[in-house]
Amino acid sequence: AFGRERMRAFDVRAASEKTPIGQLSGGNMQKVILARETSRPLKFLLAAQPVRGLDIHATAFLQNQLLQARADGLAILLISEDLEELLLMSDYLYVICRGSIVGEMSKEEAEIEKIGLLMTGERA
């Protein structure tokens, strides 16, 4: 029952809750992972490339779920190369290049051009 409820809440499209995750589409796999990870009390979630390769509808759904979890008090470390996603989803950004933090800024201070330069090792 709990699995069916989570599948419904996260709009997972599968023949049944017993369908192996490997038989699901990429978007449905990501939904299952997020449904599983947020099904118990968490203080922190690491989300690495959570919407990479997903269609626009699955992307919007997962981003909304993450934003709701953040609004509910969950701290999320989002790792992404998609600058628009980072600006949409983040309160604060750290830019890493070659394994080192090369920049940090609030969402309000962030500019796509500046972040892009920092990501490639250039000074912004």
Per-segment meaning from a language model:
Residues 1-124:
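Glycine-rich phosphate-binding loops of nucleotide-dependent enzymes
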